[in-house]
Amino acid sequence: SWNPPFCGDLDIRIARNGTWFYLGTPIGRFELVKLFSSILKVEDGKYFLVTPVEKVGIQVDDAPFIAVDFNEMEINGEKALKFETHVGDQVIANVENPIRVERDAVSDEPAPYIHIRNGLDALIDRKTFYRLVEIGQHKKHENENWFGIESASSFFPIIKSEDLDNSI
């Protein structure tokens, strides 16, 4: 694991929609964004691009990645959901890569995420979240009824069943 010296902040920002900006201008080259995403690290809630010789800070508005799709598959006879990010990372939702849903404090809108690697998350885009909800199910979780998603022998609660029933 590289531990190069911190060399200051770069004017690079990852917007909530996954767009990377340099000096306020979108980075249009996918290959460059993919390269940068491969050296992205998070430490104590701060984001860095890390190479063997330097470490620079960048700004991330929400999550650094966007989960743009998932596929249902079987692993050892069990259903699993394989997610893909906008930069091509693929992960299976499981104990190591859990799905979680946070609620916006003002609007109460759900903000769904999946862990990608080393503390880095992807915001699950709206169309993908709607597809997830279509395959969701009600299940007992920590002694309460929840609506959630099952993948790789793990259950990921989205909303309490009673809250879902009250919101319809």
Describe these PLM feature segments.
Residues 1-168:
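Long, non-globular segments of proteins
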